[in-house]
Amino acid sequence: MYKKQLIIIFLFLFFISYAQTEFITLWKPNVNGTIDNSITFGGTGTSYTISWEEVGYPQHSGLMNSVTSNSSSPITISFGTSLNTNPLQATYKLKVSNGSGLFYGFRASPDYINPNANLELTEISQWGDIIWLQQFNTAFAGCPNLNVTASDTPNLTQINNLSQMFFNCSSLAGNNSFSNWNTSTITNMNGMFSRAKLFNQNIGTWNTANVTDFSGMFSFAAAFNQNISGWNTAAGTNFSVMFKDAVAFNQPLNSWNTKNATNLRYVFSNAAAFNQPLNNWNTSKVTSFEYMFENAVSFNQPIGNWDVSKVSSFAGFNMFNGALLFDQDISTWNIKLQNFAGNSMSFGFKNSGLSCTNYSNFLIALNNNPAWANSTITSGNIDATGLVYSTPQAIMARAQLVNKGFTIIGDSYNSGCFLSTVETSKKITTPAYPNPTTGVITVESTENENVYVYDITGKIIKNMTLNKGKNSIDLTGYPSGNYLLKGNHIFTKIIKK
């Protein structure tokens, strides 16, 4: 009898240890102001089980057995009449398990492009031991009220696509469990945290060895600023838009292996804080850098050693518009003019920080490019708004480029700016305080100077003359963000709180 009891206890403990843990979520069905107390549930599986209860009122509960559904055609779950005295705040906990069948997929809404596609889903509190077989691309996209509080992690071993998984999840803050995710099978992280403006979890240990598509992964993720320098990016081909409008991001990336990268379009566009070295990046296969540093107002790192020999798209070098501080020599770039089958090409330096010396050297190098002999280019555009050129060689180079069909706009000639040492000595970081500021900032100038204040888009919002000594600039009526005060000889970055 005693042995029999031991066996029963052992079997009980054995099954308990292997007991299934559910996928648990929280929902507010009436959050949109209409009291219908029902939700659409985009689960995928056969003969699975859903149990639910009203949070705070456990006596109000229900059980659904043998559920078979597909996330492309969500089922409706009706909770009846809420016991909450304020039905608009009624919250329901759903627990989903395999039951007698298999639950293996979820999508919050088929209309994932809509930023408010699913207002009702508010929390993932447990991933459970569900083995996800349906790809997680767009799984929670369009859930602006969703946060993940689960301390466990999803089992991703049978899928490879996390693209746009949390797209437009504007309330997603997450927790430190994200650092434990096993992403070793994932190949696509396109837009995974795009527009998840609160997300800033440490995911630097993720296994990204198989990821080929990083495009848009942190675009518009305004808070994200974690060190991901240890990621294995050797398989990556598409990095376009990866940090576009990730305004806080400023972490080292120079150790990344980009040997297979072909698309670097918009990678740091509007990434206002980013200013990290990238000189170790292998760009030998890149076909387009279009708008890569557009309005990257802090970026000023040497990239003159980049291999740009594969660039072939018309706007492939239209990459520095609004890069207010960028002032590096790119005259050594091996631009292959014969790659441009469309007979035209463009360069973008509008309102960039390119000095007279570096802009002059660029004009000379482009005009003297030995590939002209094999090129079919008959036209081109150079937006050089705000730039200055000098030296007889630069004057001649510019004129010859115009004769070759180039339209060059916005630049001007200044005979007195041809010595880089003179430029460097005149370019002074102007004392400005308090910085950050809530409105009025005091700027000290060593001379009288015409200056401009640029916003993050490169737009001039103020122009004025600084007098020698202390000057006041009022930004009270302008939104919070990064601004740049810039003249011919001085510049300073201003942060408006």
Tell where the protein language model's regions lie, with residue ranges.
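Alpha-helix initiation and N-capping motif
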Residues: Q5, A394-I395, N435
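Short, structurally constrained coil/turn elements
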Residues: L13-F15, V402, K426
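Negatively charged
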Residues: Q20-F418
